[in-house]
């Protein structure tokens, strides 16, 4: 049984806005560049490079891009579930937004997940689940 399961993962430019919404899984977003505002519950966060947002299941959130002439919002995004109750609770306690001491490892793990997913070689899902699990454990430590 996987301790965590990736539902979707990608690196993209967001040039649209979404309204406050929630879902029944976690979502982790890393900001690579751009401007805008992320709303989590009633709290607005001005977007900064190398921020990480950890959105919990059923948590209201929205992403609004910056001005039309501003640099596009480039993000890393993974949507996932967590089966392990202890890890689930630890992730809930992390907080909505944080900065990592080394954002580079975060980007490298995302790139490995994306590359492995694109190739879909045998056992790729076990590998990407392992990468995500390592990311999550590093974050909650």
Predicted regions and their residues:
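N-terminal regulatory/effector-sensing and dimerization cores
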Residues: 8-93, 122-126
């Amino acid at each position: 049984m996987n301790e965590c399961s990736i539902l979707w993962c990608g690196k993209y430019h967001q040039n649209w806005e979404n309204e406050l919404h929630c879902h029944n899984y976690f979502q982790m977003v890393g900001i690579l560049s751009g401007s805008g505002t992320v709303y989590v519950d009633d709290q607005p966060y001005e977007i900064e490079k190398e921020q990480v947002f950890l959105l919990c299941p059923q948590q209201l959130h929205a992403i609004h891009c910056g001005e039309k002439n501003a640099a596009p919002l480039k993000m890393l995004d993974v949507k996932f579930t967590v089966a392990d109750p202890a890890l689930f609770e630890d992730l809930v306690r992390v907080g909505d937004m944080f900065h990592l001491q080394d954002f580079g490892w975060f980007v490298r793990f995302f790139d490995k997940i994306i590359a492995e997913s694109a190739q879909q070689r045998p056992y790729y899902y076990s590998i990407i689940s392992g990468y995500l699990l390592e990311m999550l454990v590093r974050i909650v430590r």
